[in-house]
């Protein structure tokens, strides 16, 4: 029988807490005309990347989604990329 005390224990994985890139003093403003900024939060297929991946706060994620949808409607961003 194997003694439980002899089995090596793993250290728990510690994930670094990310901060929202849109909060702070030098944070960029979310604007539907700033296509270069908005493209960083769209996947290569044209979908909006979720906030758990981009670490954007809930309030700013809603603003970001609204700005992306406005830019799509005006033809600044594509709806889908083939």
Curated annotation (Swiss-Prot):
<dbReference type="GO" id="GO:0006412">
    <property type="term" value="P:translation"/>
</dbReference>
<comment type="subunit">
    <text>Part of the 30S ribosomal subunit. Forms a tight heterodimer with protein bS6.</text>
</comment>
<keyword id="KW-0699">rRNA-binding</keyword>
<dbReference type="InterPro" id="IPR001648">
    <property type="entry name" value="Ribosomal_bS18"/>
</dbReference>
<keyword id="KW-0689">Ribosomal protein</keyword>
<protein>
    <recommendedName>
        <fullName>Small ribosomal subunit protein bS18</fullName>
    </recommendedName>
</protein>
<dbReference type="GO" id="GO:0003735">
    <property type="term" value="F:structural constituent of ribosome"/>
</dbReference>
<dbReference type="Pfam" id="PF01084">
    <property type="entry name" value="Ribosomal_S18"/>
</dbReference>
<dbReference type="GO" id="GO:0070181">
    <property type="term" value="F:small ribosomal subunit rRNA binding"/>
</dbReference>
<feature type="region of interest" description="Disordered">
    <location>
        <begin position="1"/>
        <end position="20"/>
    </location>
</feature>
<comment type="function">
    <text>Binds as a heterodimer with protein bS6 to the central domain of the 16S rRNA, where it helps stabilize the platform of the 30S subunit.</text>
</comment>
<keyword id="KW-0687">Ribonucleoprotein</keyword>
<keyword id="KW-0694">RNA-binding</keyword>
<dbReference type="InterPro" id="IPR018275">
    <property type="entry name" value="Ribosomal_bS18_CS"/>
</dbReference>
<dbReference type="GO" id="GO:0022627">
    <property type="term" value="C:cytosolic small ribosomal subunit"/>
</dbReference>
<comment type="similarity">
    <text>Belongs to the bacterial ribosomal protein bS18 family.</text>
</comment>
<dbReference type="InterPro" id="IPR036870">
    <property type="entry name" value="Ribosomal_bS18_sf"/>
</dbReference>
């Amino acid at each position: 029988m194997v003694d439980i005390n002899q089995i090596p224990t793993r250290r728990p994985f510690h994930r670094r807490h990310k901060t929202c890139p849109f909060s702070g003093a030098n944070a960029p403003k979310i604007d539907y005309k700033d296509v270069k900024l908005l493209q960083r939060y769209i996947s290569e297929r044209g979908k909006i990347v979720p906030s758990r991946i981009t670490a954007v706060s809930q309030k700013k994620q809603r603003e970001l989604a609204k700005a992306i949808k406005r830019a799509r409607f005006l033809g600044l961003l594509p709806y889908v990329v083939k």
